[in-house]
């Protein structure tokens, strides 16, 4: 039993709605699949078309992608040929001042490097190295101020808490509280409620 459905080309086959295998507009193949009544395939839904344009938003995005791919190709192909004036500017000789500057730079580079290609050490750079090494040496004797040395003397002399069998202050207070019945006041030192 086969009847044509009203949605996305679906047909009723043996009590199930099935969209048969078909080709989409873009050329891809849609597999045969079972669907519920009222199903509309995404390809069959009309796309939003903006008021001014005549392309759907997806089509516009595809065009933008194509344009960006075209722009990524080399730009030298699109560049117009060099005019005669530009050629003349490129061929003009350098002025005397520019020539002197270029020659001076070349000479200074020659002086900086030996014939082997290693860079010479100038007197200024040696002085700079001496300063850095002296500052490093002076920092070797530096003592860091750890919290132990920064604490006041009365605190440095305090004994650390010992783990002995003696009951602590906290456990004594707890035993006193257990003996008392009502909870009325708060101890100002500990913040615990005391029983009276």
From Swiss-Prot:
One of the protein's GO biological processes: exon-exon junction complex disassembly
Coiled-coil ranges from the UniProt annotation = none
Quick one: where's region Disordered? Answer: 21-53, 65-196
Q: Name one GO cellular component term.
A: cytosol
Q: Where is the composition biased (Basic and acidic residues)?
A: 21-35, 84-94, 100-143, 173-196
Bias kind Polar residues: ranges: 66-75
For this entry, the protein name equals: Uncharacterized protein C19C7.01
Q: Organism source for this protein? A: Schizosaccharomyces pombe (strain 972 / ATCC 24843) (Fission yeast)
């Amino acid at each position: 039993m086969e009847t044509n459905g009203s949605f996305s080309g679906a047909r009723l086959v043996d009590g199930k709605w099935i969209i048969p295998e078909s080709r989409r507009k873009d050329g891809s193949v849609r597999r045969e699949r079972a669907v519920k009544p009222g199903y509309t395939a995404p390809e069959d839904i009309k796309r939003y078309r903006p008021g001014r344009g005549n392309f759907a938003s997806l089509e516009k995005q595809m065009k933008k992608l194509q344009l960006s791919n075209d722009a990524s190709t080399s730009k030298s192909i699109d560049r117009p040929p060099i005019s005669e004036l530009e050629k003349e500017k490129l061929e003009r000789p350098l002025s005397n001042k520019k020539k002197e500057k270029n020659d001076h730079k070349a000479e200074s580079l020659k002086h900086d490097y030996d014939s082997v290609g290693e860079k010479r050490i100038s007197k200024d750079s040696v002085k700079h190295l001496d300063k850095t090494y002296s500052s490093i040496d002076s920092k070797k004797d530096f003592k860091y101020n750890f919290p132990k040395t920064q604490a006041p003397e009365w605190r440095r002399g305090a004994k650390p808490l010992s783990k002995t069998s003696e009951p602590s202050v906290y456990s004594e207070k707890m035993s006193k509280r257990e003996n008392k019945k009502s909870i009325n006041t708060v101890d100002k030192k500990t913040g615990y409620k005391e029983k009276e």
